[in-house]
Structures are given as C-alpha cells and as structure tokens.
C-alpha cells in the first residue's frame, strides 16, 4: 500500500456544509460555534494534503478569520459562495448523557435552502471527492459537473434524506465508491434487521464499500465479501461528539491508495 501523504498530488474536493452550531451536553453549553461537515473534513484532511478544494455556501455573517484559517491549511476556497445579506446555516442540538442520543432543538437552513453548488473548472479533475451530508440533488449536481470521474467518491447521508428524497439518493448511490451512514440508517435504507444483511443489500445498490458508524463502538467496513471492524478511541471525558462523523469521512481517503 502506497502512502498518499504527497501533499502536492493528493487533490481532494470537499462538498458540504460550513455552518454554525449551538450545542449542549452535560459538560456545558455553547451559543454559536463554527460547525459543518465540510469545515471539519477540510481541517482533518489538511495534515495529509495541501490541495484541498472546498465547495459550500455561507452568509456574510460567517467570520472571515475562519475562512482564512482554512486557507492557511491549504484549503482552496474559490468554491465557497458568500451570500451578501443572508445568514449561514445554523443547527442547535442537545446531547443526552448517552451521547449516542441527541435532540435537535432548531434548524435554520438559511443560505442552504437555495444552495446551487458550482464546481470551479480547476476543481473538476480532483482525484478524490467527498460528498458531505447534503440534499441528494445537490450531491448529484456536483457529480454531474465533474470533468473526470474521481478515483474515489465518498458520500455521506442521513435518514431525513431517505425519508423524503429516497429516489434521488438511490440515483447518486449508483455513482459512488463508499457510502457512510450509521447503524440505524443502514437498517432503514436496506429494510434488514442485521447489519451484515443490510450491508449486502446496500452494496448491491451501487457503493463498492459501506462504512457503518456506530458511535462509541467504532465503525464497520463492508466490501468485497469482507468485514473490517475498528474500535473508537476510548476517552475518559467526551465534550462534544458532533464533528466525529465528519472527520470520519477523511479516513478512507487517507488509506485508499
């Protein structure tokens, strides 16, 4: 296996939310912090590549210094749309003592409601494509704009899209290499009770590999009739689990080649 930390060659296109979060756990509460799938994917991938390209949208309320922070880590923000007079996507949630359980308090789509992704020409031959958790039609619009098929396409989704846009999601699944979802979503998408049966059915929908996220219990990788289990790193005190699944998207890319 070739190590792919060749920072000038490993081009990664990241598509997803750049957002604000307000989070409450038993350890404390925040009013508004920077969140979003694309934000954390970019930060977690930056030690391995200086050729990261971002496609997302924010309002003019998003702090400029956070964008500069990404750029200093090698993230190209040409594809980040900044909508004047509009507000950035906002999510608020509360985690239970069991942090696998959370309640959504408020969701403000704001700029995300009318987001039409534009992939700059310089992005369209990216070697790796990470499609964060977005409306399936938005993910498909990105796929349609690629000039060459990336070597690896990873897609993350959730039960809300399965409930409301299943047909669009199934279309996109035919074009991806890896799908990442949690165990509850795997059961819902497949209609199967056991994760092994669920994985077999889902990989027949298009993805060559399926990663099932299981929170504090780690994750499961299915593909090519094989199963690989990886544990979570044990921590004495977990402050905020929100971005864990986002950074998880980076791992398959780092280990792909």
Protein language model annotation of sequence segments:
Residues 38-46:
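Histidine-anchored nucleotide/phosphate-binding helix
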Residues 247-253:
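Conserved small/polar residues in nucleotide/adenosyl-binding loops
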Residues 8-24:
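Positively charged, low-complexity intrinsically disordered leader regions
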Residues 66, 138-145, 167-171:
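A short acidic, amphipathic alpha-helical/loop segment
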Residues 20-32, 47-130, 144-150:
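Conserved N-terminal subdomain of the carbohydrate kinase-like
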Residues 28-33, 231-242:
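Short pre-catalytic strand/loop immediately N-terminal to key active-site residues, enriched for Gly-Thr
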Residues 147-152, 160-229:
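Conserved phosphate/ATP/ADP-binding segment of small-molecule kinases
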């Amino acid at each position: 296996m070739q190590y792919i930390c060749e920072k000038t060659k490993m081009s990664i296109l990241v598509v997803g939310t750049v957002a604000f979060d307000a989070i409450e756990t038993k350890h404390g509460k925040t009013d508004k912090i920077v969140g979003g799938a694309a934000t954390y994917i970019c930060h977690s991938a930056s030690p391995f590549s200086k050729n990261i390209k971002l496609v997302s949208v924010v309002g003019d309320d998003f702090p400029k210094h956070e964008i500069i922070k990404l750029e200093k880590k090698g993230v190209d923000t040409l594809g980040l749309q900044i909508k004047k007079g509009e507000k950035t996507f906002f999510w608020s949630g509360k985690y239970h003592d069991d942090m696998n359980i959370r309640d959504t308090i408020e969701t403000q789509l704001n700029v995300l409601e009318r987001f039409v992704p534009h992939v700059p020409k310089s992005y369209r031959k990216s070697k790796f494509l990470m499609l964060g958790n977005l409306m399936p039609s938005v993910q498909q619009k990105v796929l349609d704009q690629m000039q060459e098929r990336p070597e690896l396409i990873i897609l993350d989704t959730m039960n809300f899209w399965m409930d409301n846009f299943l047909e669009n999601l199934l279309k996109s699944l035919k074009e991806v290499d890896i799908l990442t979802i949690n165990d509850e979503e795997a059961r819902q998408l497949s209609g199967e009770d056991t994760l092994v049966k669920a994985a077999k059915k889902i990989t027949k929908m298009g993805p060559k590999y399926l990663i099932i996220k299981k929170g504090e219990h780690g994750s499961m990788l299915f593909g090519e009739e094989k199963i690989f289990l990886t544990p979570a790193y044990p921590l004495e005190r977990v402050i905020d689990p929100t971005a864990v699944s986002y950074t998880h998207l980076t791992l398959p890319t780092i280990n792909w080649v």
